[in-house]
Amino acid sequence: PSQQPMDLFDPARKTKVKLYVKRVFITDDCEDLLPGYLRFMRGVVDSEDLPLNISREMLQNNPVMTSIKNAVTKRILNELQKKAKKDTDGYNQFWEAFGAVLKEGIYEDFTHRDQILKMARFESTEDKGLTGLEDYISRMNEGQSTLYYITGDSLAAAKRSPQLEGFKAKNIEVLYFTDPVDEFWLQMIPEFEGKKFQSVTRGSSELDEKTEKDETENEPQIDALIAVLKTNLGDRVKDVRTSTRLTDSAVCLVADDNDMDIHMERILKMHNKLDGVASARVLEINAKNPLIKTLAAQAVKDGSVDALKDVSQTLLDQAHIMEGDLP
C-alpha cells in the first residue's frame, strides 16, 4: 500500500494477506501468516504444502505455516531493502507511512532485528531529510564513538530541546527518535556496528570530555549559585551542575546515568506503567547565560539562600516547561 490505513496503530488490527492452498482460497483471517509489524501488507500467499481441508485451529500450530511465515517475512524485508538502495525517495515515502510500525520488529523479532535496524530511517539535526544509521556513522566526527539521539513526542518538540544546543555548536549530529516504539527497542539494543547509543538528555557525553573548563572570573560565584540552588531545591533535583550542553538557554534537565530517560518515563507515566515515584532529575545551568551570571553575582552575598528561594523554583519550573511537563 502507498497510504497509511486509519487503523494501522490499532493493536487489534489483523493482516490483510489472503491464504490460498493449491490456488483454492482458504482464509483472509490468518494471524500467523505474517508478524504483527508487517500488518500493513496486502497480498496473496499460495501454498502447495498445506492440505485443502486444513482448519483454522490447525493453521495456528502448523510447522509448515511457521516456515511460510519466515519465508514471506524474509522476502518482504529483502524487497524493502532493495527498494531502499534503488529508490531512495520512494522508500522514504514508504517509511514515512509505515516506518513506525516496521520498527516494532526491532523490538519483537530477534531473527530480523539487525536487518530492520539497517532499514530504519530517522530525521536528524542535519535537516537533510531521512537518514539511516549507517549513513550517520559515515558522517561522524573524527574520534566520535557514540550515536547521539534525542527522543520526543514529536519532531517539532524534539527540535526545541535545549539539550541540543551544545551538540549543534560543535557540529555533532543528533538523531531524532520520535516514535514511542523507539524508547522500547533502545532498551534492548545498546549499540549499532560497535557504536553505542547515547541520549543527549541522559548522563554525561563526549561534550563533557571535549569542552575545556573555562577559567572565568565568576567561577566562585557559579559555585556559590550551585550551592544555593541545591539548598533551595533539596530533593526536587538529584543534583545541580554546570552544563556543557547549553549555549543559549539558562537551564535544562537531564537524567542521571543510571536513571530512566526523561521521555521514556513520561510514556510509562501516561500509560500508568510507572512503578513508584518519578526520578528526580539533574538541573544543569549555563554559566555563560546572562541571567545565570546575574544570579551568580547575588549568590555570594549574605542571605542569598532566602533571597533566591523563589528564583530557584522558577528556574526548575522553566526547565520542566521546556521538557513539556507541567511544573
Which residue ranges define each predicted feature?
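Conserved GHKL (Bergerat-fold) ATPase module
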Residues: 1-327
